[in-house]
Amino acid sequence: MRKVIIYILTLLALLAAGCGSEQPQPKELQLCSSMGTKLTEVIADSYSKAAGVKVNISYLPGGTQQERLDYLRKHKFDVWLGGTSEEYFMADEQHILQLYIAKESYKVPAELRNRTGQWTSLYLSYIALLSNKNNLHAYGLYAPETWDELLAPQLKDELAIADFDLGGASFGMITSIWQMRGKEQAMAYAAKLNAQQPVYTKGFGEAVDLVYIGKKTVAIVPLDYALQMEARHRHLFATVVKDANRTMLTGAAIMRSAAHPDQARAFLDYLMSDAGVELLPANGYHYMWHVKKYPYNDGRRELIGNVRVPVDDLSWTSVYKSEIIRQWRGAL
């Protein structure tokens, strides 16, 4: 009997020692970003410090929309940060997202949020034209503010546009003109723009570079980026497109394959919190507006003025994106 008691006590001691040696697993978040490196790191570092979570960052590679979605499907990410409304719409259609409504999403105007929780809208911008002032002066032109002004004879072979397949401001040009003017007038405009022989780049950064060095005169870019470039370089000038613009939304979504869903939800809640709202302006991003502050941002209203912005039909702009681009490129 004594041996049995000793055996039991020894076993209990070993079990207790084993339990005591177990260390809590560090909190982690696997983040895939479509944003630039610097901005992604600002967001990730801020959340990491606030929540005590290690954020592992990957970046979504280039390619077609389907190639990018396939990449997200094949890898086990918790959150996809920086996608566009069209991209999230298609990702949800292909069942690679999981639903979550961030705690303070109700404070966002209805037209700027996904009310069923497939993704969380975070930031908004508009379409801008970034011009090289030296080139404009040489051509005797004012900085363009409308799409029709890009048809000036002096601007033939002087336009830089990111490839439409990448979405963003360049694809927004197509959909805004199409929705505001109707298909017939949009195709007529597309034919005239195609005759201007714009150069198509692999990203809006490359388009900006061409304008910066003076090889091209005007680039179509997001407003927040255009304003940053204008502030840094005296020979660049940003204008908001007045006649057919677009509210360009970027956000975040939780992946269906998330290994850390609790951390993913906490991350989205943080980005929608007051701390998340102030994060970008506190780090110098003054022209990328948070959707939660949209109704109160007088600076945004003063900056964009009276622009005409359609309400996007995502079931059209997303599902038929390839066909829309094909027709635009083929307009003669």
What are these regions (language model features)?
Residues 69-72, 211-212, 254:
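Hydrophobic residues within well-ordered alpha-helices
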Residues 15-18:
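C-terminal motif of bacterial Sec signal peptides marking the signal peptidase cleavage site
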Residues 86-91, 212-213, 217-235:
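A ligand-binding cleft/hinge motif common to bilobed small-molecule-binding domains
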Residues 130-135, 248-260, 279-280:
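A bilobed periplasmic-binding-protein/Venus flytrap-type ligand-binding module shared by bacterial periplasmic
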Residues 20-90:
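Early extracytoplasmic/lumenal segment of secretory-pathway proteins
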Residues 34-38, 75-215:
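Extracytoplasmic ligand-binding site segments that recognize negatively charged/polar headgroups
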